[in-house]
Amino acid sequence: MATAAATQSQPVRVVLRVRPHLPSEANSAEAPCVGLLGSHPGGEVTVQLKDQYTSRNECYKLDAFFGQESRVCEIFDQEVSAVIPGIFEGTNATVFAYGATGSGKTYTMQGTEDLPGLIPLAVSTVLALCTGTWCSVEISYYEVYMERCYDLLEPKAREIMVLDDKDGNLQLKGLAWVPVRSLEEFHEIYSIGVQRRKVAHTGLNDVSSRSHAVLSIRITTDVVKGKLNLIDLAGNEDNRRTCNEGIRLQESAKINQSLFALSNVISALNKKEPRIPYRESKLTRILQDSLGGNSHAVMIACLNPVEYQEAVHTVSLAARSRHVTNHMSSASKQETPKDKVDMEAKLRAWLESKGKTKSIQRMDGLLSPNAIKTPLSMSHKKQSASGRVSGRGKAMDQDGGKIKKVLFDSAARIPAENFHREGTQDIVNTTKKVVLPSLTPCKEDKTGSSLRKALSPISSNMDPQKQRTADDSNCLMLLELRTPMGSCNIVGKVTGATPLDKFIALGSNLKESLIQQYLDFLNVANKEELQKLKGIGERRAEYILELREDSPRPFKSLSDLGNIGLSSKQIQDILCKTATGIFK
C-alpha cells in the first residue's frame, strides 16, 4: 500500500522545567540561578540565568517556562496532551527530557505512584481515547546503553539492531511490541522494564540513569498508524565532580559523547548544512525523525536550580533546538497509483540509453531490489519536486547530504562481513561504474558507501579497531618512529642500550612530549587557536573555554579529554593528525 500524506512544517517546541530543591538542598542559602524574565504575546517567554558568585547572566527565549512550584501534570496538560490527538490521524510525536545529571529528567517522565509523570499520563490518555473504538494500543520499551540498544521488556537482555527500511525509515529489528488494554496492565509491564534499566550510584546522584530509555506507544486502526515516543535521556556528567572510575567512567564518556553528537545535529540543522550527522551516535539515529524529521517534537529542558554552568549548557542547546523545523506528515492507508514509480525500470532505461545494459544485468542477479530502490527514490524525489514529492521526500531534501551522494562510492571500503554470497568481487567491480547523472559526490562522507548502507545496519557500534583506516595506521608509525634531530641528547642517556633500544626510547619520549604539549595548549589557547587544531570545532572550543572557567588546568591527562565528548579512538586519531602535520 502506498500512503497519501499531507505535509506541514512544525518547529520543535522547547519548554523549560526547573525542579524543586531536594531535601539535601533545603538548607542551602543559594538562590535559584534561573527565573522568568517576561512573556511575549506570541507565546514566547524569556528566561534569565544568573550566577550569584560572578554576576554573569544570560537570557534565552523559549516556548514555555515551568518553575519550581509547577507540577508535572501541568506540563502534560499544556504541552504533551496537544500532540496526542494527532497520533490517531497518522502522525508521529516525540517528547524527550534533556538536561544534566540530577536535574529531574527521570522524575519528569516517570513520576511517582501519587504524582504520575508524563509517561503514565500519556498512556492513560491514549487508552481513554481508544475506549469504544477499534484502535489497538501496543508499547515497546528499550534503552541505549554504551551505544547499544537493548529491549527492556524481554526477560533476557536482547540487543536490537537499528536499520533502515527500503523507504529510508528507521526500523528496530528484534524489538518486542506488547498489546496493552488497561492502565493496570501497562503499569505491570512498564514496572518490569524500569527495573531492568541500567542505573548506578554516582557522586552526584544516588540513582543515576546510565542509559537513554525510550517508551514507544503505537496506535493502529483500519485506516492509519501513529506512534508516540517518550524518551528519558541520560544526563551529561562532569567527571571531575562525579569522581567516576572504571565502568562508570566508560558509561559517562559514552553518554557525554552521544549528547555531544546531539548538539552537533541541532547545530547542523540550525545552519541548514547539507549533511546532518545523525549517524554519529545511536541516540541521534533514534531521534532522527524527531529532529528535522517527520515527527511533532517537544523538548523538555530540565534544570537543577543551583547549578549555573549546567543550566547555561542545557538552556543554550534547548534554545537552538527551537529553530529546528520538522515536516509533519499525516499518512493514511490509501492506494495512490500516481505516486508509484518503478525506479528499477527508470534505471534500466537510462543505462540502455548510455549503452550500459551489461552492467545492470550483472547487478540484477546479485543485488536485492531494495539496494537499488532506496538511493534512486531519493534522486527521483529531488528531480520531480514540482508535483510528485511526498512529505518524506521534502524531509529528505531538507536533510540535504543524502540526495547528493553517488549511488555507489568507488573509493569506499566494503568489509567482507557485509557479504555472504559468491561473486562479491563482481559486485564491487560492477557498482564502481553505476553513477546517476544528476548526482554529485559528497566530499564529507568518504568512509561510507551507498551499497553498504543498503545492505547492512548502521555501524556506530562496530569494533573501533575495525574502523581504523590505513591512513591512521600510517600516522601511528610516524608518531612512534620519526624524531627531530634536536632530541638526540635524550637517547644518549640510555646507557648500555642497543641501537634499536635507543631508537624506541627516542620515539617514546617524542610521543610523551607531544601529548604533554597538546594538553598544555588546550589549557591556555584562545578560541581561535583551538579551532585551528584538527578535531576541534567551534562548539568544542567553546566548551573547552567553559571548562577552563571552573578550573585553570582542566586537562592534565588524555582521559580528561572525555569531558569534551571525545572517545579514546577520537583522541588517538587527533594525535595522529597532529603528528602528521609536524612532518609535512
From Swiss-Prot:
Cited Pfam families: HHH_3, Kinesin
Gene Ontology biological process terms, A to Z: microtubule-based movement
Record's keyword annotation contains DNA-binding: no
SUPFAM superfamilies: P-loop containing nucleoside triphosphate hydrolases, RuvA domain 2-like
InterPro entries for the chain: Kinesin-like_fam, Kinesin_motor_CS, Kinesin_motor_dom, Kinesin_motor_dom_sf, P-loop_NTPase, RuvA_2-like
One cellular-component annotation, GO: microtubule
Any one Gene Ontology molecular-function term assigned to this protein's record: ATP binding
Region (Disordered) location: 377-398, 445-469
Keywords: ATP-binding, Microtubule, Motor protein, Nucleotide-binding
Disulfide bridge map: none
Protein family per UniProt: Belongs to the TRAFAC class myosin-kinesin ATPase superfamily. Kinesin family. KIN-10 subfamily.
Protein name per its UniProtKB record: Kinesin-like protein KIN-10C
Gene designation per UniProt: KIN10C
